[in-house]
C-alpha cells in the first residue's frame, strides 16, 4: 500500500508540474513605454525601374542609412534598411524596413510620400525590442550629406 501511495504522489506531482509549464511561449523582453532618439545618415538610395519608364507603380526603392548616437554624432550604433514599392506615378510608396541597433532590431512599415518627413508603424522587433509596438518619426535635418532625426516612440 505504501508503494502505491508513493507512485500516486509522484504521478500527482508530475501532473502538477506539467500544468505549471506554459503551453504558449511568451517573451520577457517587453520594451515598455520608451522613446529612442538617434540620428542617421543616408548611405545609398537605389531605384529599380520596373515596367513603364520613369516612376510607375511597382518600381522599387532600396534605402540604406547608418545610425548614430544622438549625443555623440560620430558614434555609429547601427544601420537601417528599407525597401519601398511605388504605388502610383508620383511619390506614394509602401515601405518595410529594419533598424538594426546594438540590443536588437526594430521592424517598421507603412506609407512614405516624402523622405523629408514621415511616420511609420513599429510592427515588431527582436532582442530588447521583441514584440515592440509604436511609431517611428523621421525628420530631415540636413540635405548634404542627408541626415535625419529618428525618433521611436514604443508602447510595449
Predicted regions and their residues:
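Compositionally biased amphipathic helical and low-complexity segments enriched in hydrophobic
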Residues: 9-10, 14, 19, 121, ...
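Alpha-helical segments embedded in low-complexity/disordered contexts
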Residues: 11, 22, 39-41
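Beta-strand-enriched cores of mature, soluble protein domains
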Residues: 28-156
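N-terminal export and membrane-targeting signals
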Residues: 1-11
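C-terminal region of N-terminal signal peptides and the immediate post-cleavage residues
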Residues: 16-33
Amino acid at each position: 500500500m505504501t508503494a502505491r501511495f508513493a507512485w500516486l504522489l509522484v504521478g500527482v506531482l508530475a501532473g502538477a508540474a506539467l500544468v505549471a509549464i506554459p503551453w504558449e511561449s511568451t517573451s520577457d523582453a517587453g520594451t515598455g513605454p520608451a522613446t529612442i532618439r538617434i540620428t542617421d545618415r543616408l548611405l545609398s538610395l537605389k531605384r529599380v525601374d520596373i515596367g513603364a519608364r520613369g516612376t510607375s507603380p511597382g518600381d522599387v526603392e532600396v534605402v540604406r542609412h547608418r545610425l548614430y548616437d544622438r549625443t555623440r554624432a560620430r558614434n555609429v550604433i547601427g544601420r537601417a534598411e528599407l525597401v519601398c514599392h511605388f504605388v502610383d506615378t508620383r511619390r506614394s510608396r509602401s515601405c518595410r524596413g529594419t533598424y538594426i541597433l546594438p540590443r536588437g532590431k526594430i521592424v517598421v512599415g507603412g506609407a512614405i510620400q516624402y523622405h523629408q518627413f514621415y511616420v511609420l508603424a513599429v510592427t515588431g522587433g527582436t532582442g530588447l525590442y521583441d514584440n515592440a509596438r509604436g511609431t517611428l518619426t523621421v525628420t530631415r535635418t540636413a540635405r548634404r550629406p542627408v541626415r535625419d532625426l529618428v525618433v521611436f516612440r514604443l508602447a510595449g
